[in-house]
Amino acid sequence: MPATILIGAQWGDEGKGKATDLLAKDIDYVVKFNGGNNAGHTVVIGGDKYVLHLLPSGILNENVVPVIANGVVINPEVLFDEIATLNSRGVNTDKLVISANAHIIAPFHRTIDLVTERFLGKRQLGTTGRGIGPTYADKINRIGIRVQDLFDKSVLRQKIEGSLSNKNHMLVKVFNRRSVSVTEMLDYLLSFAERMRPMIADTSLLLNNALDCGKHVLFEGGQATMLDVDHGSYPFVTSSNATVGGAITGAGIGPTRVNKVIGVAKSYTTRVGAGPFPTELHDEYGEWLQKRGYEVGATTGRKRRCGWFDGVVARYATRINGITDYVLTKLDVLTGLDRIPICVGYKVGDSVFREMPVSQSDFHHAVPIYEDLPGWQCNISECESFDSLPPEARGYVLALEDLIKARISVIGTGPERENIIIRHPLGIF
């Protein structure tokens, strides 16, 4: 049975959690394949808000098996804190499965992340300080600590010693910090081993067997296309592949398994942290979007930078990921505007770009080319069909659809679970 991949089409915070929750009734497995606790998924169910940083959003559906695959980096302390929080609210987490090959975020990874970011000064990347980058760096440098290492004390000690050999030197000599004790770190990580043991599996085998048996599998991307380490606005990116290729390698499935790629985009654009953002607004409209959209990072608590919809970015996401369908979120936030600009291209010096510039220097200096569309004034949160939307809202959706070169199948019209319009049944399976 083919699989479906869900991808953020902008800079994250597009509403992927709500999209996953929407699809959960039709799926058997939800798989997190990249990142760690450096992003937050927010889902509102019956007026109750759930914010997940590490666990897959599908864990809120009791019929779904949530999987943390090999491409994820795991802070075990955060893992058990999230599990405890959900359990206290009546959510059953017993079905959670974790890859033995996922990498572990240790406290020293977080320390390295924070002191390195401070050391960069004005060149800071705006990381979340959760230790994600240093953990992936250890993975690439082949000195990482994997989940399976927690169950062999001698191997774990060797891995910790290997990882700390250069870090302690850097902490002491460069950052004037104290060195990290191998024994203390060993005891700390071993304290999680037995609690994690029942959750551990070969998740690649599990998922491929599930697909062979006709089970429905959804791969839920963390972060988004423009934060992808290869295809995003480098170096202001995350440390993993947040595009469709990341699902293949980050979960251990073959590309022929994939049937549909669903992109999630806001009806406007937001970004957290440093980096280029051509349509960013520094005026009352930017403030208006931030307040109306409650644009505060679920992980960092930082106000999100806000701007108009960027068609160049979304069309780029369509191309990079092979997106077949879009979920367009937060259309209701735009209610009340007399006019709504959308970015259809960039101007850099005397050059005009209709597609994403390959040069990051050009992207940094890109000036958006806007087309204005008429706004609407009426409340759309209770609209149940595309035809029941005001004509201006329908026109806005159709204009975006033409711009991004993929159909917009689902439209979010409010924060609640039921505030959606199914324009085209996704038919994901």
Curated annotation (Swiss-Prot):
Role this protein plays: Plays an important role in the de novo pathway of purine nucleotide biosynthesis. Catalyzes the first committed step in the biosynthesis of AMP from IMP.
Record keywords: Cytoplasm, GTP-binding, Ligase, Magnesium, Metal-binding, Nucleotide-binding, Purine biosynthesis
Record-given protein name: Adenylosuccinate synthetase
Subunit architecture: Homodimer.
Entry note: cofactor: Binds 1 Mg(2+) ion per subunit.
Cofactors (names): Mg(2+)
Reactions this protein catalyses: IMP + L-aspartate + GTP = N(6)-(1,2-dicarboxyethyl)-AMP + GDP + phosphate + 2 H(+)
Residues noted as binding GTP in the record, renumbered to the chain: 12-18, 40-42, 304, 330-332, 412-414
Residues the entry annotates as binding IMP: 13-16, 38-41, 128, 142, 223, 238, 302
